[in-house]
C-alpha cells in the first residue's frame, strides 16, 4: 500500500500507525528512512474487494424501500422520486417539512441514490440477506453501514473494488456462530473457509461497516452487546512480521527491522533454481526449519522454503571481537557447512541483425577489431566464442566473444570502404569471480540468437558478512575462531555463534532470550515449539522441560575457556536461536585500486566498485591527517594520487596561461607572449574551479611570489 504523498515532507499524521489500521495494515512492516509509514503492507488475513456491478445492487435497494432521487422505472415498476414528490407537494402547498424528517440518505459507492424512512432497519435487512446467502454470488462483496451522529443520518453501501476488508466471526445474541463442529469439519476438509463465509458464520467487514461493529478480542470477552469476534489476533501482522517468535516481548522498532531483514535472508527461493536464469540470486546450502515457530509459519509455507539455520548461541563478551554488534563464529562449524551459500550472476547477450544485411557475430574476436582487450581476456573462449560450463572465471574474463558493426564510421574508413568492427564481448564484472554454472543458447522473440551464461560463486562466511536473528539483532562477523579455542559447556558443546551481552539491555529484545530457552527446550523435547505472539506455550512449561533434562531453568550453563581450559566465572546464557544469513556479504562490497579510470570532468578517480573506483578521503579523514601533521601524506593523497596537474601562471597578472602550438610557446591571456609563466603543480579540480569562476566574470589571480623566491 503505497501513499502518493511527497517523501521529503514530514506528514506525521500520514506516517503514524492509526487505530483504524488494526487488522488491515501490518503494524511493523514498513521501510526505514524517507518511506517510513508511507509504504505499508497488508495484514495476514485481509481480503481486497474485487467489486461487483452496482446496477443490480441499486435495484435491490429500491426494492427494499429506498426512494430514488427522481422518478424512475425499476424492474417494470415506476418509483416516485424523492425530489419529484417534494416539488409536487410544494406546488400544491401541502409541504409541511415533517414528511421526510428522520429519513436516511442512502449512498451507493459514494453516490447519493435516494432516501429511506428507516436506515437502521434497511441495514439490518441487508445484513440478514447477506448472511443467509440470499443476495447471490456477490453477497460477500457487499458491505453496509448506518452512520447516525448528530445531524448526520446516512446509510453507506459499498460494493466497489479496492476496499481492504478483514474476516470476523459473527456474534448473535452474545454467542459466536463459529462452533467446535465447524472447526472439526474444517480440519477434516468437509468445509472450507469460503463455505463459512457463505453460511454467514464469518463475514468480511470494510472500514465503513466496522464503524457499526463491537468486536471482542477473545471468546471469553463476548457479551450480549458484541456483534463480532476476532478470528485470530496474530492475524494483525503481515507475512514477514508473522515469522517473529515472541514478537510481543520485543521493542516495536526491533520487529520493524526484522520485517525488513527477513526479505534479505538467504534460503531456497525456488525448487527449480537449477533451471532458472534469474539476473542474480542466492542459495543457502543447508536451510533448516526453525525449532521455535509461529502458527503463521505453517500458513505461509515458510517450513517448505526456510531461510536460516538453528545456531547454538552463547551470550558472552569472550575475546572482545564481538563488540558493537559484531559476532564471533565457530570456524569449525563454518568448515562443516554452517551458513554456506552460493551466489548466481547472469550474463546475457544477443546477436542482433541490422538494416543493410549486417549483423553481430558471436566468435573469438581477432586482434584487428576496435577495442580488443588483449589475448589474456579471451583465453577461456572455445571455438564457438562461448566459454564452457564449469570453467573458473574472474573479473575481466570474456564469457561470450562478440563483434559488432561500429556505431560511427570514420572519414578514412568511409573513403577506403573498409569498416573496422568493434568488440562488444560480455565479460565477468570487475571484482567478481566464480565458475560457469550453465550456458543457455536460444532465440529471442525476433529470432535473434540469445546467449545466457550463469556464473556461480561459493560464499563461505568470512569477516564482515552480515547475520541477523529474527528479533532485529543484526551483526557482522568479527572473528572466526577454531573449535578448540571456543568456550565449551560441561557436556562439550561449543557455540556456533557468540553474541555480546551489551546487544540486549538498551534494545529490549527479550524475545530472543525467550527463543534461546525455547530452542533448547525444543531440541531436548524433539519437536518444534509454538511461540506465536499472544498464544505461545507457557514459559513455565519450558523451564520444566529444561529442569527435567538436568539444565538450569534460566537457560544458563557453566562454561570453560577453550584456550586455557579454566572454568569461566559466572554462568553463561546459551541456547538455540534461529539465525539468518543476509545478502550483504563483504565479497560483494570490498574493493581497492592502485590505478584505474578517472572522471572526464574532474580527472579524479571514479567512485564505486563496479567502475573500478577508489576510496574517497572525506573531510574527517583529511582532518585526521592535518591533526597528525602528516603534510607529505596529505599532499600525496589529495594531489599526487588523485588529480595532479601542472598549470603555468603569469608572474605579472596571476592568470593561467596556455600553450600556443603554432608559436611553440606559452602565452598569457593578458600579457600575451611577453609574459613570464611559471609552472605550478595543483589539483585539477582546483584548476577547474578557477576556470569556472572566470566563466562567471570573476577574476581569480594566483600569486606565485613564494615559488619565485624558492
Model-derived regions, located:
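Conduit-forming functional cores of very large proteins
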Residues: 1-710
